[in-house]
């Protein structure tokens, strides 16, 4: 009997250790460089798409990625309400999308509806509070349509 109890305790402690090792995402969870994947997920989940259009050399883009996008309130809001995609506008499909969307500076942040129609956008670095306001504005515009 004592052996069974010991075995059960070992099993539960192993499971507890596993549960504690599962880590929540650190910031906004982005699909990387795949507009078509984001569009598909948005249609399936009936969510809007938040696009971070960036360039690898862009200082404000790096600041957004390393600070604002990692803010816990920003991450919770965007992960709950949007399909998030980060696209390097100078690689892969990026140049064609930059031309199609009229992007002229980085970072450019754009919200699209689930069908790929632009709702709103902005350029430049934003702090956490301003980015959440931007996201809420986008959701209110889409709700009004």
Regions found by a protein language model. Name each.
Residues 30-47, 78:
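A short beta-strand-turn-helix
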Residues 45-49, 80-83, 113-118, 129:
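Loop/turn elements at helix/coil->beta-strand transitions in domains of secreted/extracellular proteins
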Residues 58-61, 109:
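The canonical Cys-X-X-Cys-His
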Residues 92-106, 110:
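Structural alpha/beta surface segment adjacent to cysteine/selenocysteine redox centers
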Residues 104-144:
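Non-catalytic, surface beta->alpha helical segment in thiol-disulfide oxidoreductase systems
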């Amino acid at each position: 009997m004592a052996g069974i109890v010991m075995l059960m305790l070992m099993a539960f402690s192993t499971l507890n250790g596993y549960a504690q090792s599962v880590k929540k995402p650190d910031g906004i969870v982005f699909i990387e460089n795949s507009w078509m994947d984001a569009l598909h997920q948005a249609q399936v989940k009936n969510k809007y798409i938040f696009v971070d259009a960036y360039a690898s050399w862009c200082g404000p883009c790096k600041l957004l990625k390393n600070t604002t996008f990692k803010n816990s309130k920003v991450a919770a809001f965007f992960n709950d309400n949007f399909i998030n995609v980060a696209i390097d506008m100078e690689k892969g499909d990026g140049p064609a999308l930059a031309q199609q969307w009229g992007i002229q500076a980085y970072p450019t942040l754009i919200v699209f509806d689930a069908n790929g129609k632009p709702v709103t956008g902005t350029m430049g670095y934003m702090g956490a509070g301003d980015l959440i306001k931007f996201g809420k504005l986008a959701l209110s515009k889409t709700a009004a349509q």
